[in-house]
Amino acid sequence: MPRAIWKGWLAVGQVSCAVALHAAASTSDRVSFHTVNRKTGNRVRREFVDAVSGKPVPREDQVKGYEVAPDEFVQIDPDEIAATIPDSDKCLRIDAFVPCREVDGAYFDKPYYLTPAGDAALEAFALIREGMRARKAAALARTVLFRRLRTVMVRPHGAGLIAHTLNFDYEVRSSAEAFSEIPKLKVKGEMLELAKHIIGTKAGTFDPTAFDDRYDAALAELVKAKLEGRKPKRKAAPKKAREPSDLMAALRESVAATERPRRRKAG
């Protein structure tokens, strides 16, 4: 089992159990690069310099600064920042249970796996998990994680639980603002029926293994080609999408395209 990044308690009312939090997503397997000197091949290091004098600034003289006006900063010392970190009792205290579908995906931040920490926690952990599963509910809990008070949505996931940290309301931009210039159009009749038919023929199941990271694969191929002293394979230019001049004709052609494979199979 991967190392836990946080350990504490999961509590609902007077029922509690020791739990461990594990990262559910990681970018460590992606191709990554260092910055090197083209002439020597040596790695280069980053150095902080004064923006005005151009002189290097020693680490002990570097402090955080909040900009209150152009190039005017209020300096904040590390111990002053540390004093603002909320006190933690290491407890994911459940405040409420809500239907899983009620939390808008725009509020999801990062996913974590939640597991029982030790044999003594197994029974209470299973009780909380199965209770939520039976009610098709998710728990909303709050605790201090990574120096911030976070709201976390917890729900059953296989033999364990999955916990999503949630974005604060002020961090999520209003959809009304993003969609403000979209006119209200009512689609009906044959056009809507054709669209529904196309969607029906494309129905499937979510399989994350079917979605490959083409950029990372291309980077890996580039590195391999460099090591082998050959030119990397040239990628084919993607087919450009364009708006159809006749939407109804495009819908009918799409329906016909889905029907052709069926006819070949039937024949």
UniProtKB/Swiss-Prot annotation:
One GO process term, biological-process aspect: DNA recombination
Pfam families reported in the protein's UniProt record: Ku
InterPro entries named among the record's database cross-references: Ku70/Ku80_beta-barrel_dom, Prok_Ku, SPOC-like_C_dom_sf
Region described as Disordered: spans on this chain: 229-267
Domain Ku: 11-195
Gene Ontology molecular function: double-stranded DNA binding
UniProt entry tagged with the keyword Ligase: no
Subunit structure comment from the entry: Homodimer. Interacts with LigD.
Primary role: With LigD forms a non-homologous end joining (NHEJ) DNA repair enzyme, which repairs dsDNA breaks with reduced fidelity. Binds linear dsDNA with 5'- and 3'- overhangs but not closed circular dsDNA nor ssDNA. Recruits and stimulates the ligase activity of LigD.
Family: Belongs to the prokaryotic Ku family.
NCBIfam families for this protein: Ku_bact (TIGR02772)
Protein name (database record): Non-homologous end joining protein Ku
Species for this entry: Cereibacter sphaeroides (strain KD131 / KCTC 12085)
